Amino acid sequence: MRFDVVTLFPDMFGLVRDQGVTGRAHAQGLWALHAWNPRDFTQDVHRTVDDRPYGGGPGMVMMAAPLEAAVAAAQAARAAQGLQAAPVILLSPAGRRYDQAEATTLAAGTGAIFICGRYEGVDQRFIERCVTHELSLGDFVLSGGELAALAMMDAAVRLLPGVLNDGDSALQDSFNAALDGLLDSPHYTRPEVYEGVPVPQPLLSGHHANIARWRREQSLRLTASRRPELIERARGEGRLSKADERFLAGLAGERKS
């Protein structure tokens, strides 16, 4: 797994390369990260990467040539390692919403090249010539694509075998297919009673079937309350059991009473 990032701020990526579980995995060689500054691919003394927009308007636009040259260098470096050409992902408000399914797909591949835009955006001709995918974190605007790229890489890298100490941890994440795309249940640790609030009794029972059912019901309860569209999606995909449906019907009755 190799990620390449085209960015004006390569130092920002030390956060995912050097810290936490992703940093440990990087040190172990489970994935690699290479940053490419488009200023290194300019032809003028000022290392210019942006210019005024045609048609007028506020702000500046990132120029196509330095970005395309940086992508070409990244693809060449990948080819030298025997890797196939990578998808080129532009972080953009116009992109498809990144989710756990996208992270899983990304983790199953050999990596990607992320384009981190700045200013008002990037020249459309670069997008049409080089970009294969556009992705977004959500309906809000950041100062640049770096934070989005960090989040997307973190979500994908933690799914790689050997990255997490317990390989089953990722299976219990919210939105994971192992949870049928639902939200995860609440978690508790020591002490058994905190500020007068005890750990729920089923978790102390040692009865694995009861614990599993309690967690499933709490997952259903939380998802129905916070993200009801995920319940409908799971239902439409046939992921809800008869016991799940009975519990949800009971929740609906509670809300009506």
From Swiss-Prot:
Enzyme Commission (EC) number: 2.1.1.228
High-level lineage: Bacteria, Pseudomonadati, Pseudomonadota, Betaproteobacteria, Burkholderiales
Predominant location category: cytoplasm
GO MF annotation list: tRNA (guanine(37)-N1)-methyltransferase activity
Enzyme class label: transferase
UniProt organism field: Bordetella parapertussis (strain 12822 / ATCC BAA-587 / NCTC 13253)
PANTHER family referenced in this protein's UniProt entry, alphabetically: TRNA (GUANINE-N(1)-)-METHYLTRANSFERASE (PTHR46417:SF1)
The protein's name: tRNA (guanine-N(1)-)-methyltransferase
Family membership noted in the UniProt record: Belongs to the RNA methyltransferase TrmD family.
Gene: trmD
SUPFAM superfamilies noted in UniProt: alpha/beta knot
Keyword tags: Cytoplasm, Methyltransferase, S-adenosyl-L-methionine, Transferase, tRNA processing
Quaternary structure, from the entry: Homodimer.
Subcellular location: Cytoplasm
Catalytic reactions of this protein: guanosine(37) in tRNA + S-adenosyl-L-methionine = N(1)-methylguanosine(37) in tRNA + S-adenosyl-L-homocysteine + H(+)
Name of a matching Pfam family: tRNA_m1G_MT
Residues holding S-adenosyl-L-methionine: G117, L137, G138, D139, F140, V141, L142
